[in-house]
């Protein structure tokens, strides 16, 4: 992957000229894929649980969800997450609130702090389109605003959405797209999911897919493979 400072030597969105040196600061935000999509709420068991993510590139993540109010039909939860670089340094710290409906619909509002880089506020929603004993289909969307520590770099928005399908809680697939207008950048991803193990208190999934970022500032964009494991534990 190219460093953004090597690619963006003529950045001038809306008559704003940014010094090339500032792109070193933007590189983790533009390239770090884990921060594109915020934590979403959807159809899950309504009890305290956490998940650990281990990616093939060495990055990892930890998420927790704590229900604190609700009834048999609606639930509110506190959510938090940590993302780690391949060197096991904290890349992002996230906290927020989530709402879930028994029909599989959900909303979330999160605040993410990226140490040494900046902050991101995101709102996300999930809409269940179809559900029965064998099939589940969700649509999701999000909007996020990122503000960097360097005041010379303008804040920017990212919006996106996608579809997720699951068959018998065993095999699934998803597609998504995210758009950052300030950099004329579009991110595409397609993933597959296979459940390897599940019991009453835990599950282990394998995920793999392809992702691609397209921008005038990325001259040789190509599809890149992604893979990882997700372990989830209910308490």
Where are these regions (language model features)?
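Outer-membrane beta-barrel strand-turn architecture
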Residues: 68-72, 99-103, 115, 129-133, ...
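Outer-envelope beta-barrel architecture signal
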Residues: 46-48, 58-60, 70-76, 91-93, ...
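Outer-membrane beta-barrel "beta-signal"
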Residues: 222-235
């Amino acid at each position: 992957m190219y460093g953004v400072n090597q690619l963006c030597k003529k950045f001038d969105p809306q008559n704003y000229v940014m010094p090339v040196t500032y792109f070193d600061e933007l590189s983790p935000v533009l390239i770090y894929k884990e921060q594109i999509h915020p934590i979403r709420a959807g159809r899950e068991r309504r009890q305290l649980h956490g998940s650990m993510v281990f990616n093939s590139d060495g990055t990892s993540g930890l998420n927790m969800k704590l229900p604190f109010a609700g009834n048999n039909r609606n639930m509110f939860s506190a959510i938090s997450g940590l993302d780690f670089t391949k060197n096991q340094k904290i890349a992002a710290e996230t906290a927020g609130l989530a709402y879930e409906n028994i029909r599989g619909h959900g909303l979330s509002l999160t605040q993410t702090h990226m140490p040494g880089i900046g902050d991101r506020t995101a709102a996300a929603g999930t809409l269940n389109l179809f559900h029965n004993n064998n099939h589940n289909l969700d649509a999701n969307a999000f909007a996020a605003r990122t503000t960097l520590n360097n005041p010379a770099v303008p804040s920017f928005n990212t919006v996106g959405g996608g579809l997720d399908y699951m068959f018998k809680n065993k095999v699934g697939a998803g597609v998504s797209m995210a758009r950052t207008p300030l950099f004329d950048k579009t991110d595409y991803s397609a993933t597959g999911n296979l459940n390897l193990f599940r019991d009453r208190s835990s599950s282990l999934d394998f995920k793999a897919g392809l992702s691609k970022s397209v921008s005038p500032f990325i001259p040789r964009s190509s599809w890149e493979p992604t893979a990882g494991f997700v372990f989830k534990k209910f308490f």
